[in-house]
C-alpha cells in the first residue's frame, strides 16, 4: 500500500515537473520569437533587400512551429483549445453579446429619457432666472470634480455630497450609484430644491 501511494506521488510529481518544463520551454520560445521579430522588423525597415531577412523568416517559422508543438503537449493548453472550439463556448459568447447589446440599448434609452427630462425642466424654468441659473450650475458642478480642490467641490456639489454621505452604501465603490445618469440629475434637481427653499424662506420672512 505504501509502495502504491509512493508510486502515485512519484507519477504526479513527474507530470508536474514535465508540465513546468514544457511551460518554461514555451516561455523561452516566446522570448526568442519576440526578439527575432524585432530584429526582422528593424532589418526590413533599414534594408528590405538584405539576404538575412529570408533566413530570419525561416528561423521564425521554425520557432513558432516548435512552440506550437510544445503547447500541444501541455494538457491545460489542449483543454483550453478544446473548450474554445466547443459549441458551449460559442453559445456562451453569443449570450454575452446579446446581453451586452440589450444593456447598451437600455442605456441609450434611459440616457435619452433623462436628457429629455432635463431639457424639459430647463424649458419650464426659463422664466425664473434664479432657478434656471441654479439648474445649469447643478449640471456643470459634477464635471468640476477633478479640476478644483476637494473641499470646494464638496461645497459646490452639496446635493451630491448629501447623496453620497447618506444614501450611497459604503461598499458601493465604482457601482451604478456613481453613474453620471444618476449624479448629474441629482446635482441639478438638488440645486433646484435648494433654490425653491431659499425662495420660500425669503417669501415667508
Swiss-Prot record:
The protein's topology relative to the membrane is: Multi-pass membrane protein
Q: Which keywords describe this protein according to UniProt?
A: Cell membrane, Membrane, Transmembrane, Transmembrane helix
Primary localisation category:
membrane
* GO cellular component assignments: plasma membrane
State its location(s).
Cell membrane
Q: For this UniProt entry, which segments traverse the membrane?
A: 4-24, 105-125, 130-150, 151-171, 182-202
Official protein name in the record: Uncharacterized protein MJ0585
Amino acid at each position: 500500500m505504501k509502495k502504491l501511494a509512493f508510486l502515485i506521488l512519484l507519477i504526479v510529481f513527474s507530470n508536474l515537473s514535465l508540465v513546468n518544463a514544457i511551460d518554461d520551454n514555451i516561455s523561452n520560445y516566446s522570448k526568442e520569437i519576440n526578439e527575432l521579430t524585432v530584429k526582422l522588423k528593424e532589418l526590413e525597415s533599414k534594408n528590405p533587400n538584405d539576404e538575412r531577412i529570408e533566413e530570419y523568416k525561416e528561423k521564425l517559422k521554425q520557432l513558432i512551429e516548435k512552440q506550437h508543438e510544445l503547447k500541444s503537449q501541455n494538457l491545460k493548453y489542449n483543454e483550453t483549445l478544446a473548450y474554445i472550439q466547443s459549441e458551449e463556448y460559442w453559445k456562451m459568447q453569443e449570450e454575452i453579446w446579446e446581453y451586452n447589446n440589450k444593456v447598451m440599448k437600455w442605456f441609450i434609452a434611459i440616457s435619452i429619457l433623462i436628457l429629455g427630462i432635463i431639457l424639459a425642466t430647463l424649458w419650464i424654468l426659463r422664466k425664473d432666472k434664479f432657478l434656471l441659473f441654479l439648474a445649469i450650475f447643478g449640471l456643470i458642478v459634477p464635471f468640476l470634480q477633478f479640476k478644483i480642490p476637494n473641499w470646494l467641490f464638496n461645497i459646490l456639489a452639496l446635493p451630491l455630497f448629501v447623496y453620497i454621505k447618506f444614501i450611497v452604501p459604503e461598499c458601493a465603490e465604482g457601482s451604478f450609484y456613481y453613474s453620471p445618469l444618476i449624479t448629474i440629475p441629482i446635482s441639478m434637481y438638488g440645486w433646484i430644491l435648494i433654490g425653491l427653499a431659499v425662495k420660500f424662506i425669503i417669501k415667508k420672512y
